[in-house]
Amino acid sequence: MALTSHLTALLSFLLISLFATFAVCEAPAEGEGILNAEIGRLNNQSLLWGPYRPNLYFGVRPRIPKSITTGLLWSKVDNYVDVQNSFRYTCEQNEGMAGYGWDEYDTRKGGVQHIHDAGNRVDITTEFVKIPGGGHGGSWAARIRGEPRDDAPSNLKTTVLFYVASEALGDTVEIVNDGDRNGFEGDVTFMGKSQSLGDFKLVITKGKGEHPGSNHPISDKRELDKTTVQSLILSEEHLWQAKQILFQQLKAGVDEVIQDYGAENAPPPWQVYQLPNKPGTGNLHFIQKVFEGPFEFDILFSSGSAGKDVESADLTREIKATTEAFNERFADVFAPQAPFKADKYRKFGRSMLSNLAGGIGYFYGKHVVDRSYAPEYDEENEGFWEETAEARARRQEQLEGPYELFSSIPSRPFFPRGFLWDEGFHLLPIADWDIDLTLEIVKSWYNLMDEDGWIAREMILGDEARSKVPPEFQVQYPHYANPPTLYLVLEAFTERLQKTNGSQRVGKEHLALDAVLESAHVDNPSLGIEYLRNLYPLLRRQFLWFKKTQFGDIKSYDREAYSTKEAYRWRGRSVQHILTSGLDDYPRPQPPHPGELHVDLMSWMGMTARVLAKIADFVGLPEDVQEYNTAFDGISHNLVDLHWSESAGCFCDATIDEFEEHTLVCHKGYISLFPFLLGLLEPNDPHLGKLLDLLGDEEELFSPHGIRSLSKKSEFYGTDENYWRSPVWININYLAIVQLRNYALNPGPYSQQAKDLYVKLRKNIVETVYDSWEETGFAWEQYNPETGKGQRTQHFTGWTSLVVKIMAMDDLSWWTGNHVRDEL
């Protein structure tokens, strides 16, 4: 039995032990509490360690502030000139990679990543596994392999460095012996002690591979068949700058070589760029190897509380078991349906899911917030965008925190941090794979909420995160909202929970004795309901914050509407952008006006009210249910009263014209579809038919590569930044595909039209993303509606990975009305 399977066996044993004495298997309150606590403990143990530094090509750390962090660096060293630009460490878009990422990855177990480094002419493989045991998150191991690419010389020279840093004051990482003056012939072993991790042992094995040499006299000092270690003592705030620190140490070594031998008699570069062996006391330790041709070595981290050291044989066995388990589970959860049953789509799907999960990171630090609450930020006056610009220019922001966040990311090279509106989309595939992991991430986001109900739309925590963000985009404002996409995830969870729990209430369901951690909160509904009960006060606070800060003005302009309360306007508007909407440069009414109403925000609020009504009902709060139902009813009517244009045949933003009258400004595109995209229309609603006509019109929105963000007929199509002004975005297309499926399967006058569009759009989106991935090795931020080419940010395996769910949806090309499985 693989070691990772012990976790499931332990959980099953625990459940059997707890409840064997109850003949009817009903869960008493005390038993529920014990189960809840134990599931929480086991969840934390299985998720403690991971490659949670997704901005690096490979960097392992625990979900603990100020702890052990590690990282991998490498470069070719066959000449003196290229090294500065050839060292790989942080994921970058401009390094000429021929693709990189996880081909298989499970957050609880591990996986395999391939990095096709065309610039260094080497393919790097990182295999990572977690091995449970003890009380500190278990042990882990990684195998690093390098293989020269086809265009590389057989004697390719590559240097590889692994480092371990200790952030916490009082924690220690010490080398067991100093080797000899030139390095270590065999394995390199560190012993560590940490307040949060206990005792541990870290071994970097000698590994396999040839090593270059030379006839230069320096060979007496720099023996490349030995591993060198350099230990440094640095302030905590500099530890994340490992590459810059390494360059400083290498430069010192180069200066020493030139001083000793002169520039005319310099050794070959593979000896020049070797660190001298200086092991000792430190909080940053570089371990360097230099290889010729292919190579392999292991990194073995053993938790002292596990009672057994991890060995290379364990790593070999666990890699095999993890690969087999992943492939088997993927076939069960995300098996592609027709017409995507070819092997190439399964490989593609595994990569997309793995890179989404492989982008999950742990972030810790302070972020920059402007809590001046300047009156200009109320945006109540005409010309408010100029006033808010002046208020921002006063630079009244301050650092707040520290905070911690466990989250996926949109893109490892360009957006390696948490984005609030992206995260809801990220978690939809992850929820199918591991709902308990999903709930852990949702909880992490809501733990960031302030007392008013605000969560920053972008979490830029710490100096390392800020190093990737221009200063003007670092500041977060407590009156800025973002689409509340996490409610999409909570709705899916609540519906799964309802199906499991049936009509039974808390304490009456049968406990699942075969529960596993990936679905414990669904298999045991009492856990899921308790989770919702604990989260609900934060959800309600956020909903009320939206209503207070993002309200739209109905009464001041004598607008006629079913409800006087339900209208909404994004704050944070400029002339050309509403960044807070997530749709940035999408055309809006001009000039901006405090009387604007935004149909996308109204739709988000309708979806939120719908989800909160379900959750409030689940946790037994009937008065709150009524409140949300009233809000939903008002929003449903006001979408038509305030935003429907009969002449345009779509929903539109509204503003106030020069006569102080309510008027609609229609820019056909994603904005026009939002009531449909979020499922707010009934199957027989005539507005639905008009929207389906718009969506399916090839002269407007429908393209061979997906739904365009803006109509081809718009004067703004493809203009200026062209960010949300023509390109195909997968998150919005996913919402459309889900709703087309829903309307196709529900009897109504538009079901056949919805089915036909579903079949075509599903095929177009999958083929577009797949073809670009096959050609370039990457998923992309957006896709060109004319050519289908991926564009903007590469390795955008955030919401573009929704394609894995799209492939797994039903093929309805044959469907005539019989039941098919529900789609979350």
Predicted regions, residues:
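Extended, well-ordered alpha-helical scaffold segments
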Residues: 314, 318, 322, 329, ...
